């Protein structure tokens, strides 16, 4: 009785919401405790039972603050190290980001309790998953979006991973919310029926993991080398270090020419404008072609636009076997989805003078097109994504082609030091390989550099914070997963059906 009385207090529920939210961080890499996702979502649903809408919204906000406060506090590393602002301001900015993201979980909980106030199957199994899909979409879209810490990623090695090639990671989010709600209902109502349904729903997708949606092409196996330069972020954009950086990458690459078919350098490995490096690029291109190798590298490009101003791009270019390198070559990729404050500054004229954090090196990039052709290197087709873009499943899928041999992502996570951020980023990259059934080549400045197999498994990787080269044989695959064919459309149809049914059944219940 004492516990029951205690749990009814709103303050206790707010505290528990913080704890359940923080627990959710354990579901993601590097911890990879996937049951924590279910426990965290169970807590969110159970704590909002029998609460007024504003009370539920507060619980949802606190739950989100626990999740994002613990799960994305790694942004503090870059702000504190490179932001040039006092410590309290750095902490405030991290808290502000966590609070902003928590608005969406607060919105979910508040609307759920407003429209479906009764603790029923309708609320937990039909309304909650549909509403969660909508609020998670908003979190990934409003103000360019930040779809980090979606619980579907926790299943990259879990029982539900077989759902990803069929309907994508967001479908796993949907099912996790449904299962968690049913478990919460079973616990609160002390009823075994929701428990049985939850177990059945959770078990049904398990056999899907054994379906192979791809066909390996062993005759097209190539040796790939990815150079991890481990250039400190504090030195990366120092002009005096440019020559040394080029030497590091060239010296690591020279022994690989003629041995590895494909050599990959990470995001902005060449820390200079492409136009300034024409002699170096043409000489390197000639050497690569003479020895029969191809190279992909990140670089910065600036092009004169129609307004007679320069647009600066975060770019991938190709060198080596095939047609000679040309600055006018269309075989390049320009990053489309830019990171706020890292690659562009909103309200630039106001914010840039305020603090160094708003005036970081290379924070005035322009966007490339949303859809871009694959990179083509001597018959190898690469669907590319730079850094943050790899977490955008729908965008990667929209750029994917049936003849894609590999997914490619290059990144620089040196901004975030030894935090958990790079591991979360890596986990999300693995999901793209699973969704599209293609090997993924991930080349980074200081880790995590790895080759991911077409089922999301880690085939090869090298340690973080080392100057090293990952060399391994990689076999491309062919075939289209259902998700590659349809994207998120089936899930949105399901969301619409669930939402319509939930509203209709709620209206009928109120009439009676």
From Swiss-Prot:
Membrane topology type: Multi-pass membrane protein
Alphabetized HAMAP family for the sequence: Lnt (MF_01148)
Keywords from the UniProt entry: Acyltransferase, Cell inner membrane, Cell membrane, Membrane, Transferase, Transmembrane, Transmembrane helix
Quaternary state and interactors: Monomer.
Name of encoding gene: lnt
Physiological role: Catalyzes the phospholipid dependent N-acylation of the N-terminal cysteine of apolipoprotein, the last step in lipoprotein maturation. Utilizes a two-step reaction via a ping-pong mechanism. Lnt undergoes covalent modification in the presence of phospholipids, resulting in a thioester acyl-enzyme intermediate. It then transfers the acyl chain to the amine group of the N-terminal diacylglyceryl-modified cysteine of apolipoprotein, leading to the formation of mature triacylated lipoprotein.
Pathway participation: Protein modification; lipoprotein biosynthesis (N-acyl transfer)
Deleted gene: phenotype: Essential. Depletion results in increased outer membrane permeability.
Cellular-component GO terms for this entry: plasma membrane
Family membership noted in the UniProt record: Belongs to the CN hydrolase family. Apolipoprotein N-acyltransferase subfamily.
NCBIfam families: lnt
EC identifiers of the protein: 2.3.1.269
Cytoplasmic side of membrane: 1-11, 51-56, 112-123, 189-193, 508-512
Result, substituting residue 415 to A: Cannot rescue growth of a lnt mutant
Active site: 267, 335, 387
GO molecular function, one term: N-acyltransferase activity
Location relative to the cell: Cell inner membrane
Topology, Periplasmic side: 29-33, 78-90, 145-167, 215-486
InterPro entries (UniProt xref): Apolipo_AcylTrfase, C-N_Hydrolase, C-N_Hydrolase_sf, LNT_N
Reported effect, residue 233 to A: Cannot rescue growth of a lnt mutant
Domain of life according to the entry: Bacteria
Protein name: Apolipoprotein N-acyltransferase
Phenotype when changing residue 388 to A: Cannot rescue growth of a lnt mutant
Listed result of changing residue 389 to A: Cannot rescue growth of a lnt mutant
PANTHER family: APOLIPOPROTEIN N-ACYLTRANSFERASE
Lineage per the UniProt record: Bacteria, Pseudomonadati, Pseudomonadota, Gammaproteobacteria, Enterobacterales
């Amino acid at each position: 009785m004492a516990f029951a009385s205690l749990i009814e207090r709103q303050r206790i529920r707010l505290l528990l919401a913080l704890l359940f939210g923080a627990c959710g961080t354990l579901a993601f890499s590097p911890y990879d405790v996937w049951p924590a996702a279910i426990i965290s979502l169970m807590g969110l649903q159970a704590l909002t039972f029998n609460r007024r809408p504003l009370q539920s919204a507060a619980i949802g906000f606190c739950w989100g603050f626990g999740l994002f406060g613990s799960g994305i506090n790694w942004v503090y590393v870059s702000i504190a190290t490179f932001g040039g602002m006092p410590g309290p301001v750095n902490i405030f900015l991290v808290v502000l980001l966590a609070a902003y993201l928590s608005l969406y979980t607060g919105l979910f909980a508040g609307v759920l309790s407003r429209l479906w106030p009764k603790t029923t199957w309708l609320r937990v199994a039909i309304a909650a998953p549909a509403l969660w899909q909508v609020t998670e979409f908003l979190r990934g879209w409003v103000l360019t979006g930040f779809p980090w810490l979606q619980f579907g990623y926790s299943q990259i090695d879990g029982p539900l991973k077989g759902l990803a090639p069929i309907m994508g990671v967001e479908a796993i989010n949907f099912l996790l919310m449904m299962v968690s709600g049913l478990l919460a209902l079973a616990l609160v109502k002390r009823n075994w029926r929701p428990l049985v349904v939850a177990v059945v729903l959770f078990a049904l997708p398990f056999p899907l993991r054994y379906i192979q949606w791809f066909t390996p092409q062993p005759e097209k196996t190539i040796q790939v080398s990815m150079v991890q330069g481990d250039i400190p972020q504090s030195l990366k954009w120092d002009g005096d270090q440019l020559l040394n950086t080029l030497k590091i990458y060239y010296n690591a690459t020279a022994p690989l020419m003629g041995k590895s078919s494909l050599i990959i350098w990470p995001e902005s490995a060449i820390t200079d404008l492409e136009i300034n490096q024409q002699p170096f690029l043409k000489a390197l291109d000639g050497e690569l072609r003479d020895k029969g190798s191809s190279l992909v590298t990140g670089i910065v490009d600036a092009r004169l636009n129609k307004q007679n101003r320069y647009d600066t791009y975060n770019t991938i270019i190709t060198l080596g076997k095939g047609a000679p390198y040309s600055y006018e070559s269309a075989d390049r990729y320009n990053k489309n989805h830019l990171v706020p404050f890292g690659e562009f500054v909103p309200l630039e004229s106001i914010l840039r003078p305020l603090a160094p954090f708003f005036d970081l090196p290379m924070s005035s990039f322009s966007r490339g097109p949303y859809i871009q052709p694959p990179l083509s290197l001597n018959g190898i087709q690469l669907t590319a994504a730079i850094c943050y873009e790899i977490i955008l499943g729908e965008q990667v899928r929209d750029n994917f082609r049936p003849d894609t041999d590999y997914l490619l992502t290059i990144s620089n996570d040196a901004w975030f030091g030894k935090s958990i951020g790079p591991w979360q980023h890596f986990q999300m990259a693995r999901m793209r390989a699973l969704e599209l059934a293609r090997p993924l080549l991930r080349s980074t400045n200081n880790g995590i550099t790895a080759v991911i197999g077409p089922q999301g498994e880690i085939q090869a990787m090298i340690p973080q914070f080392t100057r090293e080269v990952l060399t391994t044989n990689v076999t491309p695959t062919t075939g289209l997963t259902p998700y590659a064919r349809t994207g998120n459309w089936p899930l949105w149809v399901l969301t619409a059906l669930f939402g319509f049914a939930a509203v209709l059944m709620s209206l009928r219940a109120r009439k009676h």
